Amino acid sequence: GLVGSEMCIRDRVGLISKVPDDYFVFPAAMSMHHNYFNGLAYHTYSMLMLADKFLEVYEGMNADLLYAGVLLHDIGKTKELTGPRSPLYTEEGNLLGHIVIGLQMLAIEAAEQHVDDTEEYKTLSHLVASHHGELEFGSPKEPAIMEAFALHFIDLADSKMAPISAEILKTQKGAYSSPITSLNRKSIY
């Protein structure tokens, strides 16, 4: 891992400051999870809380790298979707998807900061590239470092648990929920 890396989190997240309005109002998805106004920001916030716990429990990770991965893993959604309310996919979103778009955004920022040949940039790019975990789920690469596995598991947990939590709050005690899209339309008790 990159424990003790010199590059700190503030050097990695300049990208967010370039799209602040979009990042904080866009949904995280169109239908699967956090598909509401400011869902992307809330998804990121939830993931940061989970990352804190992962770092407490599992030793050997670079906290700055994991936090930066959480903050930037879905940055491409701000160009993949048309807007914060009732979004559609942009042409770029349809053709490339948020992972590739996010990698492009990260590459531009890294080149502007002259850090595009650093290990930190390469490993952060790996986290963005691999956060869906498996090729069949849209990741161009599968996780290869501890922080990438952690990011994938954190993202997966939040994307599954948030819809369960939202649905259970709407379900009467002793009844089954409506089918949950992100759980292959399973209902929960």
Pin down the residues of each PLM region:
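Internal active-site segments that recognize and position negatively charged phosphoryl groups
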Residues: H43-N62
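Active-site flanking loop/helix segments enriched in acidic
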Residues: Y23-Y42, S86-T90
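Divalent metal-dependent catalytic cores for phosphoryl transfer on phosphate-bearing substrates
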Residues: M32, E56-T171
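Prokaryote-biased recognition of long, low-complexity C-terminal linker/tail segments
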Residues: K170-Y189
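Single conserved hydrophobic/aromatic residue that forms the stacking wall/gate
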Residues: G1-G4, C8-I9
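Internal, conserved structured core segments that host functional sites
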Residues: K18-D22
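Short, conserved glycine- and acidic-residue-centered signature motifs
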Residues: G1, L40, L95, I99
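Charge/polar-rich, low-complexity and marginally structured segments
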Residues: R10-I16
